């Protein structure tokens, strides 16, 4: 069965640029009714919405300035009051900073879980909702291990475990909410620019050698994967998109 994005209301965290913005573009091209971009970056957010509305028509995209670690209640209330029903939440906001453990966990794990809980309860069919889909942006580092970025890897392992449990078949059948993960390989974004390991220059040089040998991809590749995953993935599953190749379940 292919799930259809036509007329769906979509919320994307970290949607002002990069993977989030590219995904909004692909979802609107597939017929989504509206994409609501929430992001702390107001400048890029305003530009993103202007570009999307210029391309797809007025009111197809909206930007809401938001710190995902602090503004969930206010922003979700605003969204639910205006749109009544949200069909898709994409938890895309994230950071890669080995020098700030607490912030990494707050954004990559805690906020992602909190937004998932809020929108899961909104979507629950047993709670008056209409069902829906939550897509969590994990990473190849949600299931692969190397020695370079343990804090980031730990955060993404948490996302994978959370997604598989929240999206468990039992829960999906009971509540009508599908939860899946997209696991991008190295992608050309601000997130992956100038990444520094925490320890020393020897480790940094080895990390950079690894990056040179790694297949890279563009944000559009991940956005297309987010469409493919929405259309075909079963709840509780996780999908790899790496080196611009077709998605593969992991």
Residue ranges and their predicted role:
Residues 16-17:
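Conserved glycine-rich cofactor-binding loop
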Residues 92-97:
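Conserved NAD(P)H cofactor-binding loop of Rossmann-fold oxidoreductase domains
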Residues 100-104:
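Substrate-binding pocket helix/loop in short-chain dehydrogenase/reductase
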Residues 139:
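Residue(s) in the substrate-gating loop at a strand-loop-helix junction
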Residues 116, 155:
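Active-site helix of classical SDR
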Residues 32-47:
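Conserved glycine-rich Rossmann-like NAD(P)H-binding loop of the short-chain dehydrogenase/reductase
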Residues 181, 200-250:
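C-terminal helical subdomain
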């Amino acid at each position: 069965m292919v799930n259809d994005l036509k007329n769906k209301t979509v919320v994307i965290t970290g949607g002002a640029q990069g993977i989030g913005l590219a995904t909004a573009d692909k979802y609107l091209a597939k017929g989504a009714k509206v994409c609501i971009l929430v992001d702390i970056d107001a400048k890029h957010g305003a530009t993103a919405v202007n570009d999307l509305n210029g391309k797809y028509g007025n009111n197809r995209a909206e930007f809401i300035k938001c710190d995902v670690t602090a503004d969930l209640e206010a922003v979700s209330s605003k969204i639910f009051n205006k749109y009544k029903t949200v069909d898709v939440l994409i938890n895309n906001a994230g950071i890669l900073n080995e020098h700030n453990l607490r912030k990494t966990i707050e954004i990559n794990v805690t906020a992602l879980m909190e937004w998932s809980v809020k929108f899961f309860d909104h979507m629950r069919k047993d709670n008056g909702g209409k069902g829906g889909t939550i897509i969590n942006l994990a990473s190849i580092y949600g299931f692969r291990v190397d020695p370079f970025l343990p804090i980031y890897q730990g955060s993404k392992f948490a996302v994978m475990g959370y997604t598989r449990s929240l999206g468990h078949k039992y829960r999906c059948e009971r509540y009508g909410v599908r939860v899946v993960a997209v696991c991008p390989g190295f992608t050309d974004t601000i997130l992956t620019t100038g990444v520094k390991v925490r320890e020393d220059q020897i480790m940094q040089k080895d990390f950079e050698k690894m990056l040179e040998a790694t297949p890279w991809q563009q944000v559009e590749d991940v956005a297309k994967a987010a469409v493919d995953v929405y259309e075909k993935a079963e709840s509780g599953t996780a999908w790899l998109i790496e080196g611009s190749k077709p998605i593969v379940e992991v």
